[in-house]
UniProtKB/Swiss-Prot annotation:
NCBIfam families: gltX_bact (TIGR00464). Disulfide bonds: none annotated. It is an enzyme of class 6 (ligase). GO terms for molecular function: ATP binding; glutamate-tRNA ligase activity; tRNA binding; zinc ion binding. The gene is gltX1. Monomer. GO terms for cellular component: cytoplasm. Belongs to the class-I aminoacyl-tRNA synthetase family. Glutamate--tRNA ligase type 1 subfamily. GO terms for biological process: glutamyl-tRNA aminoacylation. CDD domains: GluRS_core (cd00808). A motif ('KMSKS' region) lies at residues 250-254. It is found in: Cytoplasm. This is Glutamate--tRNA ligase 1.
Amino acid sequence: MTVTVRFAPSPTGYIHIGNTRTALSNWLYASKNNGKFILRYDDTDVERSKDEYAQAIAVDLDWLGVRPDRVEYQSKRFDIYAKAVEKLKTAGLLYACYETADELERRRKLRLARRLPPVYGREALKLTDAEKAALEAEGRKPHWRFLLPNFESDPFATQRTEVHWDDLVRGPQTVDLASMSDPILVREDGTYLYTLPSVVDDIDMGVTHIIRGDDHVTNTGVQISIFKALGATPPVFGHHNLLTTISGEGLSKRTGALSVGSLREAGYEPMAVASLAILIGTSESVTAAPDMAALAEHFDLASISKSSAKFDPSELDALNRSLLHEMPFEKAKPRLEALGICGAKAESFWLAVRGNLDRFSDVSHWWQVVSGDLPEAPDLSGEDRDFVRHAFDLLPPEPWNGQTWKSWTEAVKSATGRKGKNLFMPLRLALTGQAHGPELADLLVLVGLERTKSRRP
């Protein structure tokens, strides 16, 4: 058996960090088991689904390193769903209902008043053909419900009916179908709700494992019933915990909360995003994995907590810095060249500045510092300005090396009597225009004698 998983986003908005957790969990599970990953767009809502969102999802996944083995669109598979609908109707497992939303709400309140579970009472099963025809003559169109197998022979005598599965994340799970309403699978306008196309596609595409958020746990009991009604063996399920904002609010792709695109535009490394999305809310320590292979080594569905996990952007900042500070030159080289940073001193430059980067784009600033004019004029007091001028008069001749900074500052210390911060800070400001940054012993060699002299105040 080939392990086959799927990620099925709705292209009605941009995917956020929570969706990323699901996509990466499926991708890593498939990778660790030599399996296949299907990207399946749940675009049956033709009014809200947009191609621009589908394209954005593809771009986001590619940026994260998730490359599908197969891409499908549910909007192109309506004929397949129609056949499944007819199969369920023929088996007497899909029945027509005509209630309006207001009528259903009144019935729900009535059941609550009678201390009964607020589930659908299957009143539509009692309708005669003549009554159905009369309702349709009024202009009503039926929606179609799936008859849950929570009874022996009389659908109005429901009884406790347990659906069991061994969840990859949560362990043994049980759902009682008697506590649930028969789900609507087909709307009045003939369009499909999520449940039916999802099951039909999982069967047709040979999906063996479904890994998704734990907000689908109850829904799994219904879907297992539909799998069996269509004559298929249900796949293995795994339900990971959900991510929330730092304040505990749920993430929504429609509000753009922590969307993958916004994180990319903010300059985060894809592996920083992937590492946090996968490792947060698990028993694993949250560290930055340099690549997907390394992240896969730490990926274990059994390590996921059953409680929701709060996504803290400050953790993402720390992971991003960690990746940049450890990034070897060969990995950074193509990106440096794209920014015009190349030549004999490119490697020594990268090794000098990487430890001070929050975002990769920060290298452009430091390249300007070592190879051009200062982006900002140094803010030196009169006394410090005189000190720097004296210090620059003591600059040693080239060639310079890693010891030049030490020998120069020792000479300046002897000549001026300054030491510590009073010595180093004015020199840093004069050389870089900033109070903080990479080691000056490394930067001085990169700046060179002539450019250093040009910065004499």
